[in-house]
């Protein structure tokens, strides 16, 4: 160090000697006589920016990109990393000279050498130099002399010697009827194949069923006759008979045309608003979820093209010829797939029922009518179809509908075709898909359409590879591929060949081939339907079997990728992450990624698929360990002859709904996503309870996927919760000092049940990370430590006051306790003992208007504008009751004590009594209202006495304050009547010899039941859960009536003089 004298003291200064004249990568080596010279380890900035620290204190360091000046190089470096990362990559990038051989390059060159040697090529070094252009002949020669390289050569040759020769698998034509007859006559001399054995087992199962006892409309005897004659008449005749039978039990239904009267043109804005409200309410009654999503997504501007445009376009896409054969090796499975084509059981039928909300197929069979079929009849139908290996003609046809991909869809390619086959076909294919899915040893890199959280698996793998590369300064090249119309263009021949390669039973392969070659479809749009045609390619989106068939073809692709190419994560190599047709490739070198792209393109072209080069992109991360950094470089990669775009460090891209950059997951801000939708929900013609329902069940859950797998800060989550609470208060007209816990506590505990993203997001992330399954990275220490670190970070975020909120019940309990500790929420403490009483809060029923719901919520949380409430924190103001009572004007005083609301209190009490009385009479009880019982202790008048089967039940109703335990009040009421003199009087008066029981219907003025009271009434059969819910609403309404009566008479006061 050198020292210079300044007025403030001595400032140390480091002397730097710069090597080179520019900031380029062509730097000369440091000569031996300059070994003592010190120079920076990383040449990041131009030469003129290197100045002594003492001089830097006097002169500022400018940024060459934006011109901003800084006091030090460190400040400039921070600025470059945060504001100009792409320009910083350009400055940091170095040209490799005599770069080290990576393990991936060694494997690729060894495999290429084996290939060249097998082809009889000479001058191997020069030939290899042609393929490895970035390596010199001398470098290749030296590598070939190494022992580890020679071991790789021997290993590859050993694998080639063990690999069997595989012939191309082609689709043979189906045998003619005469050939089939000849095969039948010669079957006695040939051994029984597994296919014939399975058919015999299915037919034996059909004949072994016991007779079905059912209604005559199901024609059980006719179906049994078809089964008995099946082996004599053959499969074609059996199919025809089965088709006629299905038409008999499921009569063909015509197309339903609903006549909708066009709305009258509104005369003014009020009438226009009423019409909009009526339309939204009708849609709400039909399907709440669809109505909410249409309101949240804004105006749907999608317009389906006319039939003249849609039909030619999609018919050409679906009927284009596809490759007739697909070559590949036979995939070895751990166990046989013969179970796929075996007799269907009753358990299979129960597990594969079609949802009642699903649409019917062209045959008109609805899911409800299919469920009405006796299980014995349905078992026979399904197994007959299995035995025949084809579908009956009456259920072969499917209809294809189109759903828009975006709200601005206008072109034919902007719509997604969805096939809607018969409900019976969907149930049968669901059974076969479940069996096939559980029998295949799937490649661990394929996570789509499998019973696992595939999105979490693959999104976390991409994040792991990116972050691991930057942390350890390793090179990594990534390609995100977009398959154009993957489900609509897949070759049928590739499906059949893949099923054979995986060892699927012949009967199953024939069934798939028959359904695809013999099953037609018709295109349906807005009021039009095309003629039936048979698609020549593509899988049927909407059919349960289609995802599994597509997965099989993609699984075959993954098995063809070279295992030695890929990104190295610890001691494992991963080269692909697939979710159905979303494919991401990883490689350690540029050449390795190009090899993976070529392999993928070759396979996809064979199976009839194409890559959309414009939508594909690559990310090239170059590791520079000596400089302890990574840089993004724009390398050229090709799909065929088309170049793929290369992304920079700041470019964002989306994979499985999660935003990424080259450094990993991108910080997301959920407030930006939910803010506009909250505004749309505010303007929508909905009731307040409907807005809360939409917020709780649709809008907030839409954020869960991005919050669980993306990156989000705790502060951002708190701000989003604050934004949500602002709109909730606005919708319900709540004051600002309403407890926050009231918004987030669950309805069963007295709150509104709005999820708090601050706690829900880390909990969901921890749960999804805990469910991640990486079979190919199970023993990888790097992957395991990465997962554990991420889970621990989520756990740390869930620590609240020394308690870990690791589950949803724990979060709900946390908010409920905070609510009960507040002044306004203490009266809801006993609300958690019985859940159905809160149904009106969480479910948008027609019991309450929007105004009544808002007032009920304010009553529930003690937010009505009484004097005590409005003068809170200002004790100098008057708080006495405006009616002249010698008590503070509180909500409890108005509801329970004030003389002005006495009449409403009586009406509230009588309303509860009448509801219980009506329910008892519906159960066959004889009910006496307020009988006068003259006893030794005086006159007693219980509200209800119910007589049933010589048994007496005495019920008395009370609505109490919320300042005391309601269970204690319930017990006091029972003790009030459960006395010997009252029992004696009841037996004398009603001449009952049975038991006498005493009950109370105890609630507080908020509409909260005593847990012991309501549970005892329900257990004794004196009250239903529905009635308890209605009574809770009636008490709340009665309390509101008390308050309204008090406020209406607030101009008058009692003269106490």
Curated annotation (Swiss-Prot):
Protein name: Retrovirus-related Pol polyprotein from type-2 retrotransposable element R2DM
CDD domains: RT_nLTR_like (cd01650)
Compositionally biased region (Polar residues): 183-195
Domain of life: Eukaryota
Annotated keywords: Aspartyl protease, Endonuclease, Hydrolase, Metal-binding, Nuclease, Nucleotidyltransferase, Protease, RNA-directed DNA polymerase, Transferase, Transposable element, Zinc, Zinc-finger
PANTHER family in UniProt: REVERSE TRANSCRIPTASES (PTHR19446)
Reactions mediated catalytically: DNA(n) + a 2'-deoxyribonucleoside 5'-triphosphate = DNA(n+1) + diphosphate
Reverse transcriptase domain segment(s): 384-660
Ranges where the record places region Disordered: 173-195
ZnF region ranges: C2H2-type: 61-84
InterPro entries tied to this protein: DNA/RNA_pol_sf, Rev_trsase/Diguanyl_cyclase, RT_dom, Znf_C2H2_type
Gene coding for it: pol
SUPFAM superfamilies for this protein: DNA/RNA polymerases (SSF56672)
Listed EC numbers: 3.4.23.-, 2.7.7.49
GO biological process, alphabetically ordered: proteolysis
GO molecular function, one term: endonuclease activity
């Amino acid at each position: 160090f050198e020292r210079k004298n300044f007025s403030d003291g001595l400032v140390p200064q480091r002397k730097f000697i710069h090597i080179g004249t520019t900031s380029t990568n062509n730097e000369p080596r440091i000569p031996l006589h300059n070994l003592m010279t010190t120079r920076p380890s990383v040449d990041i900035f131009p030469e003129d920016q290197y100045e002594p620290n003492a001089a830097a204190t006097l002169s500022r360091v400018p940024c060459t990109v934006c011109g901003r000046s800084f006091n030090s190089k460190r400040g400039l470096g921070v600025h470059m990393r945060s504001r100009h990362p792409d320009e910083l990559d350009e400055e940091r990038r170095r040209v490799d000279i005599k770069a080290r051989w990576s393990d991936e390059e060694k494997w690729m060159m060894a495999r290429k050498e084996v290939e060249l040697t097998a082809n009889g090529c000479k001058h191997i070094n020069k030939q290899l130099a042609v393929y490895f252009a970035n390596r010199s002949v001398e470098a290749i020669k030296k590598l070939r002399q190494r022992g580890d390289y020679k071991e790789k050569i021997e290993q590859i040759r050993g694998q080639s010697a063990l690999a069997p020769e595989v012939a191309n698998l082609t689709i043979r034509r189906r045998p003619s009827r005469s050939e089939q007859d000849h095969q039948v006559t010669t079957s006695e001399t040939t051994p029984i194949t597994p296919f014939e054995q399975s058919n015999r087992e299915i037919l034996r199962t059909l004949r072994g069923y016991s007779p079905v006892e059912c209604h005559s409309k199901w024609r059980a005897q006719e179906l049994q006759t078809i089964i008995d004659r099946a082996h004599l008449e053959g499969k074609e005749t059996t199919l025809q008979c089965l088709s006629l039978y299905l038409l008999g039990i499921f009569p063909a239904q015509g197309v339903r045309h609903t006549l909708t009267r066009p709305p009258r043109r509104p005369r003014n804005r009020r009438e226009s608003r009423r019409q909009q409200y009526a339309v939204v309410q009708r849609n709400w009654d039909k399907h709440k979820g669809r109505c909410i999503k249409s309101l949240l997504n804004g105006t749907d501007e999608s317009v389906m093209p006319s039939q003249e445009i849609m039909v030619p376009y999609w018919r050409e896409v679906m009927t284009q010829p596809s490759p007739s054969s697909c070559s590949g090796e036979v995939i070895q499975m751990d166990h046989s797939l013969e179970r796929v084509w075996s007799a269907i059981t009753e358990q299979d039928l129960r597990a594969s029922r079609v949802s009642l909300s699903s649409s019917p197929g062209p045959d008109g069979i609805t899911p409800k009518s299919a469920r009405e079929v006796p299980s014995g009849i349905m078992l026979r139908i399904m197994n007959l179809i299995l035995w025949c290996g084809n579908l009956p003609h009456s259920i072969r046809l499917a209809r294809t509908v189109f759903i828009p991909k975006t709200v601005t869809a206008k072109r034919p390619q902007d719509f997604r075709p969805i096939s809607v086959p018969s409900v019976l076909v969907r149930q049968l294919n669901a059974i076969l898909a479940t069996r096939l899915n559980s029998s295949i040893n799937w490649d661990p890199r394929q996570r789509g359409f499998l019973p696992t959280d595939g999105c979490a698996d693959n999104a976390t793998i991409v994040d792991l590879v990116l972050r691991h590369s930057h942390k350890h300064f390793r090179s990594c090249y990534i390609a995100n591929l977009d398959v154009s119309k993957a489900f609509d263009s897949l070759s049928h021949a590739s499906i059949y060949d893949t099923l054979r390669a995986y060892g699927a039973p012949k009967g199953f392969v024939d069934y798939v081939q028959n359904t695809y070659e013999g099953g037609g479809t018709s295109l349906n749009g807005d009021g039009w339907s095309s003629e039936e045609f048979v698609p020549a390619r593509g899988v049927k989106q909407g059919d349960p079997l289609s995802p599994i068939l597509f997965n099989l073809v993609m699984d075959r692709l993954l098995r063809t990728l070279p295992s030695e190419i890929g990104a190295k994560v610890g001691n494992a190599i991963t080269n692909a992450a697939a979710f159905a047709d979303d494919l991401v490739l990883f490689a350690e070198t540029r050449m390795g990624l190009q090899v993976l792209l070529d392999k993928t393109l070759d396979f996809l072209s064979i199976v009839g698929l194409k890559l959309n080069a414009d939508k594909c992109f690559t990310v090239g991360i170059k590791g520079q360990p000596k400089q302890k950094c990574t840089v993004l470089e724009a390398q050229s990669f090709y799909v065929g002859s088309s170049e793929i775009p290369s992304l920079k460090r700041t470019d964002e891209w989306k994979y499985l709904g999660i935003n990424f950059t080259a450094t990993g997951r991108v910080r997301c801000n959920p407030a930006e996503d939910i803010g506009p939708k909250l505004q749309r929900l505010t303007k929508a013609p909905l009731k307040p309870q409907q807005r809360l329902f939409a917020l709780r069940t649709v809008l907030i859950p839409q954020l869960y996927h991005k919050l669980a797998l993306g990156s989000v800060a705790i502060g951002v989550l708190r701000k989003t919760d604050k934004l949500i609470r602002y709109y909730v208060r606005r919708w319900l007209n709540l004051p600002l000092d309403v407890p926050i816990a009231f918004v987030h506590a669950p309805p069963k505990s007295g709150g509104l049940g709005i999820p708090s993203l601050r706690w829900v997001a880390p909990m969901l992330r921890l749960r999804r990370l805990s469910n991640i399954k990486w079979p190919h990275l199970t023993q990888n220490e790097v992957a395991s430590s990465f997962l554990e670190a991420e889970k621990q970070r989520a756990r740390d975020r869930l620590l609240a006051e020394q308690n870990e909120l690791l589950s949803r019940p724990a979060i709900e309990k946390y908010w409920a306790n905070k609510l009960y500790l507040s002044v306004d929420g203490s009266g809801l403490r006993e609300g958690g003992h019985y859940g159905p009483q809160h149904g009106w809060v969480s479910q948008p029923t027609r019991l309450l208007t929007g105004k009544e719901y808002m007032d009920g919520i304010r009553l529930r949380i003690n937010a009505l504008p009484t004097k005590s409430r409005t003068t809170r924190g200002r004790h100098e103001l008057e708080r006495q009751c405006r009616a002249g009572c010698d008590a503070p004007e509180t909500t409890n005083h108005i509801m329970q004590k004030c003389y002005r609301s006495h009449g409403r209190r009586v009406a509230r009490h009588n309303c509860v009594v009448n509801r219980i009385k009506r329910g008892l009479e519906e159960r066959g009880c004889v009910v006496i209202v307020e009988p006068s019982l003259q006893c030794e202790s005086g006159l007693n008048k219980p509200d209800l006495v119910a007589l049933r089967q010589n048994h007496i039940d005495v019920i008395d109703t009370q609505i109490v304050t919320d300042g005391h335990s309601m269970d204690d009040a319930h017990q006091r009421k029972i003790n009030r009547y459960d006395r010997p003199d009252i029992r004696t009087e009841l037996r004398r008066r009603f001449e009952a010899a049975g038991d006498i029981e005493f009950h109370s219907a105890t609630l507080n003025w908020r509409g909260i039941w005593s847990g012991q009271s309501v549970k005892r009434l329900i257990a004794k059969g004196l009250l239903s859960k529905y009635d308890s819910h209605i009574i809770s609403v009636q008490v709340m309404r009665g309390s509101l009536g008390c308050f309204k009566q008090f406020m209406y008479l607030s101009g008058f006061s009692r003269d106490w003089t």
